[in-house]
């Protein structure tokens, strides 16, 4: 047309806050097209493409920096333009990934191509160690769930290791239908007790492993009442998590300085939740281990477990699922007495569990039969160590070449053994 249009030097554009919109409880997929901002997206994309000549700004937080650069120097340096362009591309990618995540059916994260958008929930003081940076992220656009939905009632902000302990402890507590207290430390169970009285659950867990409670996390699957709260004040537990707290319990717990008190009413897990682990050169993704058994465990010995043994075996099996492999758990009645984790072999794990038990009560016998759960199939030598340690009932995955010999040994010793038919490795 013979008209020379001026060039754009700065393009400032943002998009609908799609993550906040689709995460609303009453949002419907039919409304999504109203918030797909194609015009601004195209303009920002074009500006970011021509980053050598055009300054692309997608965050309000960058406005003052850009204005100051034009005011003081007449423009931005090439490096600053590239930085802003990269931020724009990241912004666009996160926007589109959020839409893709929202529209995708559950369980598609194992497709050939995976696009994921994460938003920062909180900056953490440090990672596993003080020299490591860390932050807590959640899926962009997802409705708050799990620890992202937790409410901190009292105490300092959480660090990286607190999140790990809280996740393990509360997941373990939610495995139980009856009242339970699970104490975890360093991302593994220390003690678990399931009794009708919540206060007795806490007493049992603390008595089983007093050292494990120091700096650990106590999780409950019921609203915490005043009696249990008063007992917690006498411990060195660092964090408490439960579905809720009575007003009196919350008042008591808030009186202890430094105690982190969290409520987490929503279930930690969704049926389709996945686990991601970074490795050199890539990321491993797997479905979460949400299954306790494939089917009812099979009793493979002549003697069947008594009612008390069966209850103890189930308690121990739920606990060993959350201990690091190789793991062994010894329980008595409704209390886990010893947890051995991260053994280099199942034999070492069982021997360590027996040693810990004897170290804590070297003389007096217990009130009931001891049971042992192992997360991996047991060779004959390992089973011998378990029975020699006092176990009268064992639950293990089965499927080892020594299975028949193990059954024969249990029958000779009058012990009972269940094959769970599923293993629970955890690394």
Residue ranges and their predicted role:
Residues 1-107, 196, 222, 228:
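Active-site loop-to-helix "anion-binding N-cap" substructures in soluble metabolic enzymes
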Residues 3-13, 17, 95-427:
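ATP-dependent carboxylate/acyl-activation modules
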């Amino acid at each position: 047309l013979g008209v020379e249009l001026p060039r754009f030097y700065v393009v400032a554009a943002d998009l609908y806050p799609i993550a906040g919109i689709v995460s609303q409880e009453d949002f419907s997929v039919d409304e999504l097209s109203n918030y797909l901002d194609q015009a601004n997206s195209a303009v920002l994309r074009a500006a970011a493409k021509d980053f050598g000549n055009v300054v692309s700004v997608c965050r309000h937080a960058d406005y003052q920096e850009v204005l100051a650069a034009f005011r003081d120097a007449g423009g931005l340096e090439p490096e600053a333009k590239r930085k802003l362009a990269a931020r724009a591309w990241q912004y666009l990618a996160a926007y589109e990934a959020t839409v893709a995540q929202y529209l995708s059916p559950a369980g598609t994260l194992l497709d050939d191509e995976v696009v994921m958008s994460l938003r920062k929930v909180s900056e953490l003081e440090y990672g596993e160690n003080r020299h490591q940076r860390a932050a807590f992220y959640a899926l962009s656009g997802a409705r708050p769930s799990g620890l992202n939905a937790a409410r901190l009632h009292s105490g300092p902000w959480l660090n990286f290791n607190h999140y790990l302990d809280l996740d393990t402890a509360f997941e373990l507590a939610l495995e139980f239908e009856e009242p339970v207290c699970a104490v975890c430390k360093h991302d593994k169970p220390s003690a678990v007790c399931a009794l009708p009285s919540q206060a007795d659950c806490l007493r049992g867990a603390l008595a089983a492993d007093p050292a494990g409670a120091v700096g650990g996390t106590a999780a409950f699957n019921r609203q915490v009442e005043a009696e249990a709260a008063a007992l917690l004040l006498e411990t060195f537990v660092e964090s408490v998590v439960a579905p809720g707290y009575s007003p009196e319990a919350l008042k008591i717990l808030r009186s202890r300085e430094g105690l982190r008190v969290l409520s987490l009413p929503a279930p930690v897990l969704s049926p389709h939740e996945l686990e991601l682990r970074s490795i050199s050169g890539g990321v491993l993704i797997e479905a979460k281990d949400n299954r306790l058994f494939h089917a009812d465990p099979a009793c493979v010995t002549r003697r069947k477990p008594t009612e008390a043994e069966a209850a103890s075996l189930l308690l121990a099996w739920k606990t060993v699922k959350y201990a690091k492999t190789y793991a062994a758990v010894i329980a008595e009645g409704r209390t886990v007495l010893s947890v051995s984790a991260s053994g280099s072999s199942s034999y070492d794990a069982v021997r360590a569990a027996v040693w810990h038990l004897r170290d804590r009560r070297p003389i007096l016998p217990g009130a009931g039969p001891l049971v042992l759960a192992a997360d991996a199939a047991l060779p004959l030598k390992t089973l011998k160590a378990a029975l020699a340690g006092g176990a009268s009932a064992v639950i293990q995955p089965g499927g080892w070449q020594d299975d028949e010999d193990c059954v024969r040994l249990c029958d000779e010793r009058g012990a009972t053994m269940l094959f769970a038919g599923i293993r629970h490795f955890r690394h």
